[in-house]
Amino acid sequence: MMANIWWSLPLTLIVFFAARKLAARYKFPLLNPLLVAMVVIIPFLMLTGISYDSYFKGSEVLNDLLQPAVVALAYPLYEQLHQIRARWKSIITICFIGSVVAMVTGTSVALLMGASPEIAASILPKSVTTPIAMAVGGSIGGIPAISAVCVIFVGILGAVFGHTLLNAMRIRTKAARGLAMGTASHALGTARCAELDYQEGAFSSLALVLCGIITSLIAPFLFPIILAVMG
């Protein structure tokens, strides 16, 4: 057991940084470090019989670092404060519309495909951070665990393909790119933005926070409306 725990942290770091080197060298979207780490580590754990609990205990320090990492996102916001003040009305409008669209589209598609209201409620908060999504999903009758899975899936999609899509649409403005990524793919999209550009990361962080607040406030009122319209 101790051997399994000891290897968890170096395994995670080696795979992640190796994936970063590959991504920097080949510039291929699917070489996203998070995605590569999952593709490598999950089969490794299954093949070796190491339980997730053992793996998590060994790499728990990385989980503990998430809290200061989130707090550190406030610094880029402070650096861009003058631009945020100048555009605050547009920023709030964009985040509000983006949050509503994210909730309506995912939930509506799920209902059209025959999903139960419980599953639809779980999918609704897919574009916000995991703790908020689990709380919101549970409060409107969903299953928090499914909400968490949806958040991870959407975040990976955004981190892997988000910038490719923005480039294809010829969206070049840093603020617009950051707001789009933060609104659509929460923390994982924000992390990707922060890797590529300081200003993008700042605006993505702002969208991450605002969309979490907006979603938690309007989801309880919006979900019954979606059910009534789609039902």
From Swiss-Prot:
GO terms for cellular component: plasma membrane. It is a multi-pass membrane protein. Residues 23-29, 112-118, 161-208 are cytoplasmic. InterPro entries: CidB/LrgB, YohK-like. It comes from the Bacteria. The chain crosses the membrane at residues 2-22, 30-50, 91-111, 119-139, 140-160, 209-229. It is found in: Cell inner membrane. Residues 1, 51-90, 230-231 are periplasmic. Keywords: Cell inner membrane, Cell membrane, Membrane, Transmembrane, Transmembrane helix. Belongs to the YohK (E.coli)/YwbG (IPA-22R) (B.subtilis) family. This is Inner membrane protein YohK.
